[in-house]
């Protein structure tokens, strides 16, 4: 165990893999991405790249050895604090106007930038600072590779009312589960995109985010607190030269009614946004410096992060162990869809919703040595036949909120209520072994397969 003194307005940056390290605040005050640390109790961190900042100076007790650690004197925290005060000013304006006009909204902020520029960290800081002033902005995550209160391949939103759980895998906290939580559980709204990148199927991605945006603004219209507090939208990494992503970004801005764009880590992107929205008087584009602690996330680290999120979803962690239910189901009773990439989409029909073909059409696709008979192939989904269920081995399946009798268009339009893991498939007996976080039968037999795989 060692003690680390952090001077005022400095931060201690660290990287840790395994085993976990334990950090305790001994004196002073400190915060982890905006969330204030309590004096005394230990905090456990594993497989994270983090930073603890102090405004007045503090002393930490650290047990364990981070792979990288140093104290940084130059940080952008003052800029982030000023940004928070600017957003709070807009919330006060909306609050004052709300007395006479219920349509007055607080700031709807979109954070954009290239890979590993610190967008999610800034969102956590702004969310935590807002909570300290009794504001509760809706948090939105549109990055399917870095889930928020969900599993990889999903986009989600939640109306936060409590502090973030900094020890959780994603740094936000836990959604409702079968066990107790140290911090009040969050209740997210989740849509399954199912693919790694928005560019894998831009039309499906834009459809999913439009449904999520509709729900967010429905919540804001019904709650004065949410309406005045506004929303914070985190996006996936921008590929500056990808024209399709610029189209996606425009959909995000219009669907979520964004009035502030925060650009991190790219002068070129900032100039592009300023030029593109020069005539949009309702939209402000703000350039903010990335922290010097931002580190490129290697593909291996992203995969480990996703695996940790999946494991925690089913088995919990050291603070809250969970026991998932292993169930054997009749695969003939399930309706399983596979999410299509744009290059795989079937021809669009002008008379059927969302581009789906007639149910009696069939297409065959070769996947290695397995012949897949996939029914009703459409623009976004294709139904997997019982004979082809072996491809589900080790897959994470999203459980749709609609029943198996609904058509594919309704499934695409609907949110999901959870996930199951396919641990075994017996194509001879038409049986499938599923791991479920809930000790009861599946609430819906309509399941969706994306690209997410996991090895227990």
Curated annotation (Swiss-Prot):
Q: Which UniProt keywords apply?
A: ATP-binding, Cytoplasm, mRNA processing, Nucleotide-binding, Nucleus
Where does it reside?
Nucleus; Cytoplasm
| One function term, GO molecular function aspect | ATP-dependent polyribonucleotide 5'-hydroxyl-kinase activity
Q: Which InterPro entries match?
A: Clp1, Clp1/Grc3, Clp1_C, Clp1_C_sf, Clp1_N, Clp1_N_sf, CLP1_P, P-loop_NTPase
The UniProt family comment states:
Belongs to the Clp1 family. Clp1 subfamily.
| Function according to Swiss-Prot or TrEMBL | Required for endonucleolytic cleavage during polyadenylation-dependent pre-mRNA 3'-end formation.
One GO term of the cellular component aspect?
A: nucleus
Report which superkingdom the organism of origin falls in: Eukaryota
PANTHER family for this protein? CLEAVAGE/POLYADENYLATION FACTOR IA SUBUNIT CLP1P, POLYRIBONUCLEOTIDE 5'-HYDROXYL-KINASE CLP1
Task: Give the main localization category.
Answer: nucleus
The protein, known as? mRNA cleavage and polyadenylation factor clp1
State the encoding gene. clp1
A biological process (GO) of this protein is: co-transcriptional mRNA 3'-end processing, cleavage and polyadenylation pathway
